[in-house]
């Protein structure tokens, strides 16, 4: 695999871009106009996927927030049947909304399964 390349003008990461006129692969900065010809024509794509709960910072006070709706959803950690919930966007390729539950007894955050 190749190393990341950085812009010599603003130090942001360079991204692959096709130069259709010269028919070469270039590495271009998304922040300024800098670009350079890529040393190789190989492009690697890395996709990282994680759950919404891992990406969401849950306030410890969420379970005591009177404005959040409540549910009798069972907590997978303590098996109590009371949780507050709210919606968040998925960070994956789709734009579906996901329900995040926070147990009012132990504060554990979990997604609807």
UniProtKB/Swiss-Prot annotation:
Q: Where is the composition biased (Polar residues)?
A: 54-66
Q: Which InterPro entries match?
A: DNA-dir_RNA_pol-M_15_CS, Rpa12/Rpb9/Rpc10/TFS, Zn_ribbon_RPB9, Zn_ribbon_RPB9_C, Znf_TFIIS
Q: Where are the zinc fingers (TFIIS-type)?
A: 71-111
Q: Does the keyword Disulfide bond apply?
A: no
Q: Where does Zn(2+) 1 bind?
A: 7, 10, 29, 32
From what superkingdom does this record's organism come? Answer: Eukaryota
User: Which residues does the annotated region (Disordered) include?
Assistant: 54-74
**GO BP term, pick one:** transcription initiation at RNA polymerase II promoter
- Keyword hit for Cell wall biogenesis/degradation: no
Q: Name one GO molecular function term.
A: nucleic acid binding
Q: What does this protein do?
A: DNA-dependent RNA polymerase catalyzes the transcription of DNA into RNA using the four ribonucleoside triphosphates as substrates. Component of RNA polymerase II which synthesizes mRNA precursors and many functional non-coding RNAs. Pol II is the central component of the basal RNA polymerase II transcription machinery. It is composed of mobile elements that move relative to each other. RPB9 is part of the upper jaw surrounding the central large cleft and thought to grab the incoming DNA template. Involved in the regulation of transcription elongation.
What family does the entry list?
Answer: Belongs to the archaeal RpoM/eukaryotic RPA12/RPB9/RPC11 RNA polymerase family.
Q: What is known about its subunit structure?
A: Component of the RNA polymerase II (Pol II) complex consisting of 12 subunits.
This chain belongs to the protein called: DNA-directed RNA polymerase II subunit RPB9
Source species of the chain:
Schizosaccharomyces pombe (strain 972 / ATCC 24843)
């Amino acid at each position: 695999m190749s190393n990341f390349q950085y812009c010599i003008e603003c130090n942001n990461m360079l991204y692959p871009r096709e130069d259709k006129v010269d028919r070469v692969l270039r590495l271009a900065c998304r922040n300024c106009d800098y670009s350079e010809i890529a040393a190789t024509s190989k492009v690697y794509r890395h996709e990282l996927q994680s759950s919404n709960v891992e990406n969401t910072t849950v306030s410890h006070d969420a379970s005591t927030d009177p404005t959040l709706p409540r549910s009798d959803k069972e907590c997978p950690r303590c098996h109590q049947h009371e949780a507050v919930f709210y919606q968040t966007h998925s960070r994956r390729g789709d734009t579906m909304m996901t329900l995040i539950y926070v147990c009012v007894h132990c504060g554990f955050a979990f997604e609807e399964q």
